[in-house]
């Protein structure tokens, strides 16, 4: 198992949205069960919000890529919420 897999773990959508807000992204709109978030500099990402499910590592890595942050750093911010 590589180091990134050890550090990345599933997270609740609520915690991911809080972490993105701490990074300066704001919820622009919601469509169905997805929240579209945008940073003032133009970076965007979409977060699925399903109350009984967690966001898996692959999607967390994709969200981190969308906003231009290292996945491990993003996980650290999520864990601080």
Short names for language-model regions:
Residues 6, 50, 64:
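Short, flexible active-site loop motifs that bind/organize anionic cofactors or intermediates
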Residues 1-29:
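N-terminal first-folded block
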Residues 55-81:
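C-terminal structural segments of small proteins and small subunits
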Residues 26-59:
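A short, structured beta-strand/loop element
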């Amino acid at each position: 198992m590589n180091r990134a897999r050890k550090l990345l773990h599933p997270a609740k959508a609520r915690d991911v949205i809080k972490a993105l807000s701490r990074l300066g992204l704001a919820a622009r709109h919601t469509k169905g069960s997805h929240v579209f978030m945008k940073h003032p500099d133009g970076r965007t990402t979409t977060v699925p919000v399903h109350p009984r499910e967690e966001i898996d590592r692959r999607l967390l890595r994709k969200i981190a890529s969308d906003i231009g942050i290292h996945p491990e750093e993003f996980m650290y911010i999520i864990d601080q919420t």
